[in-house]
């Protein structure tokens, strides 16, 4: 088997945090403090933020409060301002951040997330030698990697983190089809309003999800065009894995009919039946 070091020592940045944010000055500060205050080595972490250019309060709080905090820690960081794209184009923020990232691994973070694990960055490093989608544990208890952690190589192969708005579902379904999801002992608390009662704000209220209408809206995550595209993207990554000698039997057998249920291993990680409503469409 050919080996490829996905955490090369010559790269001073191991992990790039990709963080789109809107309208949440205090939660933005909190999400970064819980992340970086519990990091073993913040100097090897890069924070990349995406702001809407009309989000003046959020930008001001970042400049006045968060930026000095990052400077004091010695953390690499950068921020990109966008003409507002909106939640339905969330992936475009992330794809642009990923394009400019320095890290060997990418970590999609949220401005309503709270890190609960000390030395979480070392846990990622300890699991970053091979090509996996790393799945942290969350209060969702969901089979998806709600906060995807993936090698930069993924973006090099596919050209993006996700072509669809629902980034966690996209990367998770591709990874489950390849049987390359690896759960790591990192706990993240997602303080989303419908989960915890926190952050009932305009950002949450304007959160439109392109799912649950696959027969009606061609933008829907489970529309046949997107399902076909996920297969195509999975094939690209499978070809890369084949080239380095990784086992892709699970995916290949599913495509030829030898494996009748490509989602069987994902379902085992779904004790609360979170995906039950999409069983016929995933």
Give the location of each predicted region:
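Short, acidic, metal-binding catalytic loop of nucleotide-sugar glycosyltransferases
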Residues: 33-44
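Short beta-strand/loop segment that forms part of the nucleotide-sugar
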Residues: 43-56, 80-84
């Amino acid at each position: 088997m050919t080996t490829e070091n996905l955490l090369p020592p010559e790269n001073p940045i191991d992990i790039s945090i990709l963080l789109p944010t809107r309208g949440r000055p205090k939660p933005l500060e909190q999400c970064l403090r819980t992340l970086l205050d519990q990091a073993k080595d913040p100097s090897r972490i890069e924070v990349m933020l995406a702001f809407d250019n009309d989000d003046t309060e959020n930008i001001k709080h970042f400049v006045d409060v968060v930026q000095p905090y990052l400077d004091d820690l010695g953390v690499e960081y950068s921020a990109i301002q966008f003409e507002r794209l909106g939640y339905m184009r969330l992936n475009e923020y992330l794809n642009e951040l990923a394009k400019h990232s320095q890290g060997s691994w990418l970590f999609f973070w949220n401005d309503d997330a709270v890190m609960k694990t000390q030395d979480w960055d070392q846990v990622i490093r300890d699991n970053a030698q091979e090509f996996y989608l790393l799945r942290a544990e969350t209060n969702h208890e969901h089979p998806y990697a709600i906060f995807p952690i993936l090698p930069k190589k993924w973006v090099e192969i596919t050209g993006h983190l996700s072509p669809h708005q629902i980034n966690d579902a996209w990367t998770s379904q591709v990874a489950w089809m390849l049987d390359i999801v690896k759960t790591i002992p990192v706990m993240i608390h997602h303080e989303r309003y419908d989960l915890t009662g926190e952050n009932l704000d305009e950002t949450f209220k304007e959160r439109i999800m392109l799912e649950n209408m696959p027969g009606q809206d061609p933008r829907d995550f489970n529309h046949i065009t997107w399902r076909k595209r996920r297969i195509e993207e999975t094939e690209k990554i499978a070809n890369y894995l084949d080239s380095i000698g990784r086992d892709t039997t699970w995916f290949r057998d599913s495509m030829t009919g030898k494996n009748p249920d490509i989602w069987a291993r994902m379902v085992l990680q779904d004790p609360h039946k979170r995906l039950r409503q999409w069983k016929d469409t995933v």
